[in-house]
Amino acid sequence: MLLKTFYTQQWLDDETFKKLLTFSRFLGRDKNGSQFVIDIERARRNKVKLDDILSILSELGIELSETDLREMAKYLPEYDVEFELKDGKLIIKPHVFILDIIKDYKDKGILKYDKQSKVYVTDPYYYYQIKNRLEENGLKIKDLGLDVKELNINFKGELRDYQKEAVDTWLQRGSGVIALPTGAGKTVIGIKIITEVRKSTLIVTFTKDQMLQWRDAILKFTDANRSDIGLYYSEEKNIRPITITTYHTAYRHIDELSGKFELLIIDEAHHLPADRFKEIALKCIASKRLGLSATPVREDGKHEELFKLMGGLIYFKTPQELIQKGYLAPFELIQIRVNLTSKEKLKYATLLSQFRKVAGGKKVSELIQLVKEGNSNAIEAMKIYNEMKKIVNLAENKLKALDDIIQKENGNKILIFTQYVDQAEEIAKKYNAYLITGKTNKNEREKILRIFKTLKSGILVLTTVGDEGLDIPDANVGIIVTGTGSRRQFIQRLGRLLRPSNGKVARLYEIVTRGTAEEYQASKRKDITFGLDIYSSSEEDLV
């Protein structure tokens, strides 16, 4: 865009001439002197500011009218780049040429250029990265003017040596994932980090129960007032210097939450890479990020996305390391193998044959994707597959083996895990055990946990609701009647037993059906290390 034409009769040395060419074009000489025209696009490309143009012209005795100044200010504003948030996206409005600075972001598909609006569009996650890059290159930035509150609270607890190491490692980096076994005090680490950052914090939990546990732990381990903590959930949506929400609520309301926090804490962070939930991290601007998980490695490989969004895996300890130091109870893993009955074997074999025929050699992961696309063959194959799993999980001899284990462990505190509510109810009724499923209301659940905690012996039956998010009292025996095959679930269940107690050795029994995919998965778990190589046998192993 060409604007004001100007003349100068002064002799121009090379340096001055080159400066003029950074924001104007030389049109030639005539009787009035050297003629130039101001070129806005050239000025932008060379990152020349309006003040610089006026200074150079002033040295040559050239004054611009108020009209010219207003027109130039419109196209060459005070800032080189402006940021704004719009519809959950970060808008980058350049007034100078910046592609040379951010080309790598554009090449990777992180930045999109809107030709009509002449702006770059990306996720708010990249705000600080791009802002810092532009400032390092000398550009003047109009930032988002974020409303981040100060947080003046102090830590009242005591950290174990590995917790101190984890906190120090995180503080050196300002972001990252900390992986520690269940029962190792990840929440306390998060609270200590909140008191060190001393800025407004958003905590995202997987369940409502975890949300309440975080609130209670913050009140216990800091001098924070209850008014410092806001729960953002259901009808109660209070934003405070410390705001606690759930994955589902954060996903739905992230545009409201995005720019208000300096620190983002993601609990049970292995859930974050799910297609919907990763939007929480992508749309949140927080410059400091902490992920907490007992099992950060995902079976689908998406943990790499988790590490990218949260700052990489920066600290971890295995259960074995903490057991050696006495922080967790030692444990035994005991696999009990049972046979299918003749009737179950026949039905399983028939279904397996049907599955292989309908699946056409495709892996289960491929079938699941095809189901999402509405493929009828894949839908039929997965129906058969689920029937096969049900035969294995509900095998008659599993309940006989369960009976033997319960008799053997009589007098201990036992947790029984199953995938099926009907099976859980049947087991609880048979052994006069306590029962918690997804159908158990909050008050009843709290009552059961409170009672079970006081018992020296007893049985508590749990469905998958017990895998994460429940503060389950100490027990020393666990029995997996049915599971998903996931190592993550296996580790979560083992973790329920590892809280230390005098002379306690935790035992986790797994009842496995011979001659099925369940047996293959169980054999792979024998070599479990609990470190970063916690990859489960995937769904591919089931057929």
Swiss-Prot record:
GO terms for molecular function: ATP binding; catalytic activity, acting on DNA; DNA binding; helicase activity; hydrolase activity. A motif (DEAH box) lies at residues 267-270. Residues 1-111 are annotated as: N-terminus. ATP binds at L180, P181, T182, G183, A184, G185, K186, T187. The keyword Metal-binding does not apply. Its EC number is 5.6.2.4. The keyword Nucleotide-binding applies. It catalyses: Couples ATP hydrolysis with the unwinding of duplex DNA by translocating in the 3'-5' direction; ATP + H2O = ADP + phosphate + H(+). A motif (RED motif) lies at residues 298-300. Residues 77-146 are annotated as: DRD domain. It comes from the Archaea. Residues 320-328 are annotated as: Flexible hinge region. Residues 167-314 form the Helicase ATP-binding domain. SMART domains: DEXDc (SM00487), HELICc (SM00490). SUPFAM superfamilies: P-loop containing nucleoside triphosphate hydrolases (SSF52540). Keywords: ATP-binding, Helicase, Hydrolase, Isomerase, Nucleotide-binding. Residues 398-543 form the Helicase C-terminal domain. Belongs to the helicase family. RAD25/XPB subfamily. The N-terminus (residues 1-111) is essential for DNA destabilization, it contributes strongly to ss- and dsDNA binding, but does not contribute to ATPase activity. ATP-dependent 3'-5' DNA helicase. A DNA-dependent ATPase; single-stranded DNA (ssDNA) stimulates the activity more than double-stranded DNA (dsDNA). Binds ssDNA better than dsDNA. Destabilizes dsDNA in a non-ATP-dependent manner; blunt-ended DNA is a better substrate than 3' overhang DNA. Probably destabilizes by binding ssDNA, increasing amounts of ssDNA decrease destabilization while increasing amounts of single-stranded DNA binding protein (SSB) increase destabilization. Bax1 does not stimulate the ATPase. Conventional DNA helicases unwind DNA by binding to a ssDNA overhang of dsDNA and then translocating on this strand with cycles of ATP binding and hydrolysis to 'unzip' the dsDNA. XPB1 is believed to be an unconventional DNA helicase principally because it translocates in a 3'-5' direction along dsDNA instead of ssDNA, thus it is referred to as a DNA translocase. This is DNA 3'-5' helicase/translocase StoXPB1.
